[in-house]
C-alpha cells in the first residue's frame, strides 16, 4: 500500500507531531508500505495563498494531485491552532482538494434555469481511498469539547466538509496533552 503523508507542523524535527510522523513512517515501512512524504514547511516551492482567480492552478498543485492519485492513503498530520489546522496545511487543502478534481456538484434538476445552483456532491479522484487525520491539541480534551453538537470542530470540518465530499473513508487519531 502506498501512503501519502502531508505533514503540516512548523517544527519538522523535534515536535510531538514529528515523532508521530517518524514513528508512523518507521512502522508502516516495516509492514511493507511505501511512503510519500510531503513536508509542507520543507518544500522548495511553496504554494501561494489560495486564490480562485488563479486558473489553471500552479504546477505544484497538479504535482501534489498526481502524488495523491498514485497513493492508496492520504494521511494529514498537524496540530490544532485556534480550532483549525495550521495555515500551511489549510492552504494545501484549499488548493489540492479542490472541486472538479476532488469532488464536483451534480444538479438536482439538470438543465433547469431555476435549480442550477442546487445539487449534491459527487466524489472525484480520491473516491474510496482512506483518509487519515492526526491532530494534536496540546491541552486536555475538555478544553476542546463543550459537549454539544459542535464538539471537536476542527476534526468535524476536515472529516465531514473535506474528506466526505471527496468520498474518502476516514480514520481519526487525536492526541491531547501527553
Language model features with spans:
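N-terminal beta1-alpha1 ligand-phosphate binding loop
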Residues: 1-33
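Residues at the starts of beta-strands that form the adenosine-phosphate
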Residues: 2, 34-36, 130-131, 168-169
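Short hydrophobic segments within beta-strands
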Residues: 6-8, 38, 134-136
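A short, flexible beta-alpha/helix-coil linker loop
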Residues: 9-11, 138-142, 177-178
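Glycine-rich phosphate/pyrophosphate-binding loop and the adjoining helix
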Residues: 25, 143-178
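A short beta-strand-loop structural module common to alpha/beta enzyme folds
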Residues: 33-45, 173-176
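N-terminal beta-loop-helix "entrance" segment that forms/cooperates
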Residues: 39-58
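Helix-loop-strand module that forms the ligand-binding subsite of alpha/beta enzymes
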Residues: 56-156
